[in-house]
């Protein structure tokens, strides 16, 4: 049985991680931390978990207790894992970080986007970017895994086949992405209030979103060179989901793009390339660790449109983190994640 610790268990990614781990046959949550809710039972805060974690209580972070776990997940704001990851690694505990702390390879670039110095630059070289469809073999050997963000997951999975094949003009990529409100986190913010977010949609961070350098980094690795990406995120009045509409110029009209995508993801348990002409819906992935993709070439022209949908809390966060844990410990990566999406 894998002994699991969770740092930061009161946010949406934390409770989603608890929900998924409750169904995992080879993992047990030993420690879950929250400074603000220390002493409170998990099942009292989250009634949906009654019967699964009736005796588990939130506690103040304790490196000794966390270090006794086989793996520790960080479901925290950026900056927290910087302070604790090194000590846990020294104790022999593996770390899976759902925050942005170790996603970017360049400490200076991280500091520019997050407005503070990187707190653990010495760990960046060994941090493995946890996108299994790209880095599965590296994940198997990792001590420290950086779980990709939600927008980066949907965008990279949608564009990588075109870039790996050298088909797309990498200098003119567009990612037009929509997110549910849970992507903004559980903290109280005016923009997330029902009367603000309901029955409305808006773009934000058009000048530059923190996920932009992460997406660009992944696309550069796929293409083997520089990329030019315009990324525009939007907030939509739904709770869960990411819908990415991706645009790339592909001059070669003889390529069977449907076959290209089907071949690239043929052995991927959590990527579903839908039949030609499909329009994937966010509701088709709600609660599931799956990315559904459809590829289109409107009017048979040079502009290719890829539609990519995920649940931002599952394949975009906690489900992908659990998928990484399964790979890390040599398990079937579908373990605890094979359930169907919720519908309606």
Swiss-Prot record:
- Cite the InterPro entries for this sequence: AGPR_AS, AGPR_type-1, NAD(P)-bd_dom_sf, NAGSA_dehydrogenase, Semialdehyde_DH_NAD-bd
Q: Which GO terms describe its biological process?
A: L-arginine biosynthetic process
Chemical reaction(s) catalysed = N-acetyl-L-glutamate 5-semialdehyde + phosphate + NADP(+) = N-acetyl-L-glutamyl 5-phosphate + NADPH + H(+)
Print the keywords alphabetically: Amino-acid biosynthesis, Arginine biosynthesis, Cytoplasm, NADP, Oxidoreductase
EC nos: 1.2.1.38
A Pfam short name: Semialdhyde_dhC_1
Is Cytoplasm set as a keyword in this record?
Answer: yes
Determine if Amino-acid biosynthesis is one of this entry's keywords: yes
Q: Which domain of life is it from?
A: Bacteria
* Localisation: Cytoplasm
Sorted alphabetically, which HAMAP family does this protein's record hold? ArgC_type1 (MF_00150)
What family is this? Belongs to the NAGSA dehydrogenase family. Type 1 subfamily.
Q: What is this protein called?
A: N-acetyl-gamma-glutamyl-phosphate reductase
Its source organism is Pseudomonas aeruginosa (strain LESB58)
């Amino acid at each position: 049985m894998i002994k699991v610790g969770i740092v930061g268990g009161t946010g949406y990614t934390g409770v989603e991680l608890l929900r998924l781990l409750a169904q995992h046959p080879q993992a047990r949550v030993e420690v879950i931390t929250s400074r603000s809710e220390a002493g409170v039972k998990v099942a009292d805060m989250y009634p949906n978990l009654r019967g699964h974690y009736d005796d588990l209580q939130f506690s103040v972070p304790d490196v000794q207790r966390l270090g006794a776990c086989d793996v520790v997940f960080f479901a925290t704001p950026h900056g927290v894992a910087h302070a604790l990851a090194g000590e846990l690694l020294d104790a022999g505990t593996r770390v899976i970080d759902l925050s942005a702390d170790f996603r970017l390879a360049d400490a200076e670039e991280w500091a520019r986007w997050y407005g503070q110095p990187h707190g653990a630059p010495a760990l960046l070289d060994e941090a493995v970017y946890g996108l299994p469809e790209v880095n599965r073999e590296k994940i198997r050997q990792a001590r420290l895994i950086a779980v990709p963000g939600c927008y980066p997951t949907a965008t990279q999975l949608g564009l990588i086949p075109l870039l790996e094949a050298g088909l797309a003009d990498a200098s003119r990529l567009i990612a037009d992405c929509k997110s549910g409100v849970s992507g903004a986190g559980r903290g109280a913010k005016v923009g997330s209030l029902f009367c603000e977010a309901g029955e409305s949609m808006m773009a934000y961070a058009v000048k530059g979103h923190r996920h932009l350098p992460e997406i660009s980094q992944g696309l550069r690795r796929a293409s083997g060179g520089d990329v030019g990406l315009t990324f525009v995120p939007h907030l939509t009045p739904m709770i869960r989901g990411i819908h990415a509409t991706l645009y790339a110029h592909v001059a070669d009209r003889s390529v069977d793009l449907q076959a290209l995508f089907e071949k690239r993801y043929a052995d991927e348990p959590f990527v579903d390339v839908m039949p030609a002409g499909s329009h994937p819906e966010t509701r088709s992935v709600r609660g599931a660790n799956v990315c559904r993709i459809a590829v289109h070439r409107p009017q048979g022209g040079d502009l290719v449109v890829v539609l990519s949908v995920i649940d931002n809390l599952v394949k975009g966060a906690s489900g992908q983190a659990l998928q990484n844990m399964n790979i890390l410990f040599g398990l079937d990566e579908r373990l605890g994640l094979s359930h169907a999406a919720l519908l309606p």
